[in-house]
Amino acid sequence: MSREKKLSALGKSMGKQMIRSWEAPQFSLFSVVNCKNLIRYRNLLPVKMSYTTILVKTLADTLAEYPILNSSWDDGSKIIEHEEVNMGIAVDTKRGLLVPVIREAEKKSLEEIHEAMTGIKEKSWNGSFNMEELSGGTFILSNLGMLNISAFTAIVNAPNAAILSVGKMKDEPLVQDGEIVVGKTMTLCLNMDHRVIDGAAGAKFLTALVQRLEEIGR
């Protein structure tokens, strides 16, 4: 037996926003991260932090060097490169998908981002974010690794120019010093609005991000 489920105001708003976002010509780039140094770096931190926290910090630092990825499409008249990296974090809540924003993430230390992520986690249980906390994002990070997803693409949230999707860490065969060893890897997918970002710019950014993650703590 079927039953109707009326959309909430939030659901209606999200539906309209997804249609608007899907109208943008989007493309994807994938890259795999060798997580050996990332795991070691996290284990050596004096305070236990999530991988998402470390990703936010590394991503914000990389976006500051590649501002075209931290841009917005302004309805065909201009492209806006944002000075601040206002990082949206896609989270699952009782109210559905919400994207709280860490403002000026590029200026924050790892400890400050950890504090912000702790606050987001606490509010995610019941979705008790206010509109100010959910607005003004310039780039979104979506991590489904904890839900056992290996890799996925995400829709760029208009007017943003890009979104990064992160899959789970998994064991894979790797070539090291001419030998095959088992190592931890994770797949990153960068989805972009092709009106703002071309393939070369996206590739340079994603390569720089992967390099930062693989060399972290050195």
Residue locations for each model-derived region?
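C-terminal catalytic/motor cores of large multi-domain enzyme assemblies
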Residues: 1-218
